[in-house]
Structure formats: structure tokens, C-alpha cells
Amino acid sequence: MPTILRFRGLRVVIYSDDHRPPHVHVIGADREAKIALGGEGQRPSLVVNEGLSRREVALALVEIDRNRALLMQRWREIHGDA
């Protein structure tokens, strides 16, 4: 489970044995959210939230959107074409 980004006490990871569509997991202490990276022209979106605050989710969406190209590149490196 490579950590791709870190911000404000949260880690953004991509599980190597995960499934499509492309998404990341945002992990904090005893909490996690799954965020879809979205297709071309789409913004990342929350899929599942297990304990992150609204503020943490909002921050995660901004950071993931800002780093979407890097995250898609890493997804492809781990899983092949998206």
C-alpha cells in the first residue's frame, strides 16, 4: 500500500490489490475515506467515509484534485491503464 501523498496528518494511498474505477484511500488515525479520482473532466468525489470530519473530507478532495495527474499516473503504474 504505497503512500502517495501526506497532508495535515492524513495519508493518501493506493492499495495494490484494489479494483477499478481509479480511486484512493485517505487514512488518518482510526478513520478512512475512499475517494474516486474521476474521469477526464470530472472532479474527485467521495465514495465512502468512515470517520473523517467534513473539514478533512473537503481538504482531501482539494488535495486530490490538485494532485490528480500524479495520482492517476501512480494508479496506472500499480494497476495498468485506468
Where are these regions (language model features)?
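Intrinsically disordered, low-complexity sequence elements enriched in Ser/Thr/Gly/Pro
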Residues: 4, 32, 41, 66, ...
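Intrinsically disordered, low-complexity segments enriched in polar/charged small residues
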Residues: 11, 28-30, 73, 79
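C-terminal structural segments of small proteins and small subunits
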Residues: 52-82
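A short, structured beta-strand/loop element
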Residues: 15-52
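Short, charged/polar N-terminal "headpieces" of proteins
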Residues: 1-22
